C-alpha cells in the first residue's frame, strides 16, 4: 500500500477505473477470505422466503458497491498518505463482502441490482467531495456510513429465517467488519457527525434500499 502514494495522476486514474470495473462487473471481485456461507448447510426455504432474502442480499450487495465507491473517492482526494492508505485497505476488505453477497444472490436464483452503476457514481462523488473538505470529515463520513450499514444488517438479520444459515453467516461477519471500520475511522480522528446529518444520510439510504430490493 505504501508505494501507492508515489503513483502519478494517470496511474491513480487507471487504478480507479480498474476498481470500478472489478466492483461492477459480475464475478470480477475476488475475495481474500472465503465466504462464511461455505461451511453452513443449505436450509429449506419457501419460494416466498427465497425471493425476500434475495432482495435483502441485493440491497446489501448494492451497499457494498456504494462502500467501494465511497472509499475509492475518498482515497483519491485524501490529503494525508496514512488516511489514503486506510481508505484503500478498507476498500480491499469490502471486496470480500461484495463477492460474498453476489455469490449468495446467485445461489438464491437472482442477480445484483441494475442500478449499481448509478449508485457507484453517486457514492464516488460523495466520497471525493468529503475528502476535499478535510480528512477528518472524510473519516467521519466513513464512521457514520458504517453505522448506517450496521443498522441495516441488524434489520435484515431480524427478517432472515434461522433456516437460512448461509445468508445469516455472511451478514453476521459483515456486521463485525463494518463495526470495526467505524471504530477505526473514529480512532483515526474522524468527526462525529451530529444527529441531523445522520438523519439525512438515513433518508438517502432508504432511497437505495427501496429501489434495489426488486431491481
UniProtKB/Swiss-Prot annotation:
CDD domains: DMQH (cd01042). InterPro entries: COQ7_proteobact, Ferritin-like, Ferritin-like_SF, Ubq_synth_Coq7. It is a peripheral membrane protein. Its cofactor is Fe cation. It catalyses: a 5-methoxy-2-methyl-3-(all-trans-polyprenyl)benzene-1,4-diol + AH2 + O2 = a 3-demethylubiquinol + A + H2O. Disulfide bonds: none annotated. It is found in: Cell membrane. The keyword Iron applies. GO terms for cellular component: plasma membrane. Fe cation 1 binds at residues 64, 94, 97, 178. Pathway: Cofactor biosynthesis; ubiquinone biosynthesis. Its EC number is 1.14.99.60. One of its GO terms (molecular function) is 3-demethoxyubiquinol 3-hydroxylase activity. Keywords: Cell membrane, Iron, Membrane, Metal-binding, Monooxygenase, Oxidoreductase, Ubiquinone biosynthesis. Binds 2 iron ions per subunit. It comes from the Bacteria. One of its GO terms (biological process) is ubiquinone biosynthetic process. It is an enzyme of class 1 (oxidoreductase). Belongs to the COQ7 family. Catalyzes the hydroxylation of 2-nonaprenyl-3-methyl-6-methoxy-1,4-benzoquinol during ubiquinone biosynthesis. This is 3-demethoxyubiquinol 3-hydroxylase. It comes from Pseudomonas paraeruginosa (strain DSM 24068 / PA7) (Pseudomonas aeruginosa (strain PA7)).
Amino acid at each position: 500500500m505504501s508505494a501507492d502514494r508515489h503513483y502519478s495522476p494517470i496511474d491513480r486514474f487507471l487504478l480507479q477505473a480498474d476498481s470500478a470495473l472489478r466492483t461492477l462487473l459480475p464475478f470480477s471481485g475476488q475475495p481474500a477470505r472465503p465466504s462464511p456461507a461455505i461451511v453452513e448447510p443449505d436450509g429449506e426455504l419457501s419460494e416466498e422466503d427465497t425471493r425476500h432474502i434475495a432482495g435483502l442480499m441485493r440491497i446489501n450487495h448494492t451497499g457494498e458497491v456504494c462502500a467501494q465507491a465511497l472509499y475509492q473517492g475518498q482515497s483519491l482526494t485524501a490529503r494525508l498518505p496514512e488516511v489514503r492508505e486506510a481508505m484503500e485497505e478498507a476498500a480491499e476488505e469490502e471486496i470480500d463482502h461484495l463477492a460474498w453477497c453476489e455469490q449468495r444472490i446467485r445461489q438464491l436464483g437472482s442477480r445484483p441490482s441494475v442500478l449499481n452503476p448509478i449508485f457507484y457514481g453517486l457514492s464516488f462523488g460523495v466520497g471525493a467531495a468529503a475528502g476535499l473538505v478535510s480528512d477528518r470529515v472524510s473519516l467521519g463520513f466513513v464512521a457514520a456510513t458504517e453505522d448506517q450499514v450496521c443498522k441495516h444488517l441488524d434489520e435484515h438479520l431480524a427478517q432472515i429465517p434461522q433456516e437460512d444459515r448461509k445468508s445469516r453467516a455472511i451478514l453476521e461477519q459483515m456486521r463485525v467488519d463494518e463495526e470495526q471500520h467505524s471504530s477505526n475511522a473514529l480512532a483515526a480522528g474522524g468527526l462525529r457527525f451530529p444527529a441531523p446529518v445522520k438523519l439525512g444520510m438515513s433518508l438517502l439510504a432508504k432511497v437505495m434500499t427501496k429501489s434495489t430490493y426488486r431491481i
